[in-house]
Amino acid sequence: MIVGIGSDLCDIRRIERSLERFGERFTQRVFTPGERARSDRRAARAPSYARRFAAKEACAKALGTGLSQGVFWRDMEVVNLPSGAPTLRLTGGAAARLAALVPPGHRARLHVSLTDDPPLAQAFVVIEALRDESC
């Protein structure tokens, strides 16, 4: 069953301006070390950061909290599955909120779609609760 859906559209130029103006102060506040390493390896850093920014916003919406109620930017990390598909690793307040959304006897699966077509980056996050067969 679907327990949360979120989407976000991010202007890549806005992220580019934040990178130019605030540099590491911006990236360290919003992104995990792993996300920074992946984005900083790219020739075009801004689209990579913008996709991740949009994913975090979409995730916060899917959790039903936005960036409040103990959910912080770095509680949500865009990572890749072995297949290369993006997903999110949640910690802290985001993980606690996810646990509260998922009914007993179920486990969460996060579906993430990321894209960019300059000047925009977009993300969709769907939180699915699957029956846990081990219960």
Curated annotation (Swiss-Prot):
Name of encoding gene: acpS
EC number of the protein: 2.7.8.7
Free-text function comment from the UniProt entry: Transfers the 4'-phosphopantetheine moiety from coenzyme A to a Ser of acyl-carrier-protein.
Catalytic activity: apo-[ACP] + CoA = holo-[ACP] + adenosine 3',5'-bisphosphate + H(+)
InterPro entries, alphabetized: 4-PPantetheinyl_Trfase_dom (IPR008278), 4-PPantetheinyl_Trfase_dom_sf (IPR037143), ACPS (IPR002582), Ppantetheine-prot_Trfase_dom (IPR004568)
Domain of life: Bacteria
Transferase found in the keyword field: yes
Family matches, as SUPFAM superfamilies: 4'-phosphopantetheinyl transferase (SSF56214)
Chain sites annotated for binding Mg(2+): 8, 57
GO CC annotation, single: cytoplasm
A Pfam family the protein falls into: ACPS
Listed GO MF terms: holo-[acyl-carrier-protein] synthase activity; magnesium ion binding
Protein name: Holo-[acyl-carrier-protein] synthase
Biological process according to GO: fatty acid biosynthetic process
